[in-house]
């Protein structure tokens, strides 16, 4: 793969992912967690969590469940807040 340009993830910036990321950020700040603390609790890297909040990652349902668990939030409530 030498010499090949790095491709952006196909879903990066999708409005649904951006809305979900914003809902995660709001929930995180509401409970007073830093991005790093949420990442530790959800068992992901801090830079990955930053990408989640910017809508750069297409999350698996298990990742959403782990993040919601760390936020003490229901996935359905977070999705509803995101308008999804």
Where are the model-predicted features located?
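N-terminal flexible/basic segments that precede or flank functional cores
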Residues: 1-26, 30-31, 36, 69, ...
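Glycine-centered small-residue hotspots that permit tight backbone geometry or close packing
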Residues: 21, 47-50, 83
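Helix-turn-helix DNA-binding elements, focusing on the entry/boundary residues of the two helices
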Residues: 24, 35, 46, 61-64
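Short alpha-helical DNA-recognition segment
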Residues: 32-51
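DNA major-groove recognition helix of helix-turn-helix/homeodomain DNA-binding modules
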Residues: 60-77
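Short amphipathic recognition helices of helix-turn-helix/homeodomain-type DNA-binding modules
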Residues: 77-84
């Amino acid at each position: 793969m030498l010499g090949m340009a790095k491709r952006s993830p196909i879903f990066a910036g999708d409005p649904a992912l951006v809305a979900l990321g914003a809902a995660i950020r709001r929930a995180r700040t509401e409970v007073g967690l830093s991005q790093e603390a949420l990442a530790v609790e959800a068992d992901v890297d801090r830079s990955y969590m930053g990408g989640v909040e910017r809508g750069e990652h297409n999350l698996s349902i298990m990742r959403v469940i782990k993040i919601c668990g760390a936020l003490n939030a229901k996935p359905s409530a977070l999705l509803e807040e995101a308008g999804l």
